[in-house]
Amino acid sequence: MKNQIVIISLILCMILLSFCKKGGSEPTPDPIVPDPVLPKINITIDKSTKYQTIDGFGFFGAADVWWAGAGSLWNDAWGEKVISDLGITIWRNEIFPPSIAGANQDADWAKQKPVVQGLKEKADKYNLNLKFIATVWSPPADLKWECNFSWAGDLAATRNAGAVSTKNGGTLNPNKYTEYADWLKSNIQLYKDAGVDLYGLSLQNELMFRQTFNSCMYTSAWFNEMANTVVPKIKANYPNVKIFGAENMLDMEGKDENWSVFYHSGIKKSVTTTANIDILAVHGYSDGIAASSGSALAKMWTNHAAQFSTPMNKQAWMTETSGYVDAWEKTGDKPGALNLAMDIHSGLYFGNMSAWVWWQGSQGTMNEFSLMNGTTTGKKYSVSKQFYRYIRPGAVRVKSTSSDQDFFVTAFLNTAKGTHTIVIINSGSADKAVSIKGNDLPTTFKMYRTNSGTENCTYIKDVNSGVSNSFAVPAKTIVTLQAGGDAL
């Protein structure tokens, strides 16, 4: 009996040992949880086909509007946020004319200088060559005349001496071009004295519109005449300052029925003015206030590239837009944050746009004109960050195609930084599984995503490229894929 017990025990031990050799004693790996089974689409990146080089992304203004108290315009936390988190690489400012009786100004250089120097210090901290650009809304009042015209090509336009202000339009006195150039040069020097080389200068903001705030108006012929006289005087002292313009509406400079009769057409017709304008700049409004948004932008940007920036060999910038609510999708007639993402895409993809500059970066309340309230951010900020933070100056857009019409894709290679960036927008109502293919792509990308919920340019996970790999892109989201380290 004892022998039988021993034999049975030995048999049980052998069975147990056999089970262990099959792996029962080895740690069991965590189960691989794949993305849900979703309809699959392909995105193809062709790095051999190259388009525009990126100059940057940014906004206008200080931590609050210029008419706010000086103490609210700069603080260290805000400066840190916009440089190291949002990732602006362009900052736009107004050159204010002197105040006169009945026409006070929101700011002067004494009020602006601490903001300029604060941003420069923050940019230097991160080895960022922040591009400072400035726009004139109105020349000094004593340099202006009255004017009257109905559109840019109005041959019956008149201008003459009269009672004028910095507000409510008027035009530059053509006998004061030298004085205007001298005034502009003195303002460029203010930046230089503060340790900043001004990167770009616009001679006039939205030159078609008579506004109750600072404004000045030009016909196409007057603008060319002014630029051809003033720019050489500026360049004689500051040859590296880039002149951008005309800062008119993309609706006017890009629509089928408009592009041939407005300012960029006038610039193109003049060999001299073409040489004097370094960068073609438009604003993303239909009338100076309402945002130009939606599918029509693709045609406007396509026209602008085909008619102007490509044949003239000029960079294209979008230097002001707003009018988007912070809701994720369109509210009434106001576009939302997801619309903003698609509109940035339109400029990059269809217009070969090199720069995108929002209107007011921050103010005391978050509204359709601002991205932030101090350091408090919303969906427009997060959507902007998907582009600003990861597509850095010097990045070159390369060819990208999608097999799904609901997916909008732009891709960028930054050789100097060794980074690859792909921005994907799923505008549709269905989640999809995405495969990224192309020659010589990084194996792994970090994925950042913004949606209508709690994701705000949030790191999701690492994903792999290649046709055998895929990752989920939920409906109505924007994703940025980044490889090669931190772009900042």
Language-model features, listed with the residues they occupy:
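Sec-dependent bacterial lipoprotein signal peptides
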Residues: 1-18
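Bacterial Sec-dependent N-terminal signal peptides
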Residues: 16-40
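N-terminal catalytic cores of secreted or lumenal carbohydrate-active enzymes
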Residues: 40-199, 203, 211, 218-224, ...
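Structural recognition of the beta-strand scaffold that forms the well-ordered cores
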Residues: 53-61, 87-95, 131-136, 199-203, ...
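Noncatalytic carbohydrate-binding groove/subsite architecture in carbohydrate-active enzymes
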Residues: 177, 214-343
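Aromatic/acidic polysaccharide-binding cleft in carbohydrate-active enzymes
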Residues: 315-389, 398-402
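Carbohydrate-binding surface patches
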Residues: 403-443, 476
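C-terminal beta-strand-rich structural cap/linker in extracellular carbohydrate-active enzymes
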Residues: 461-488
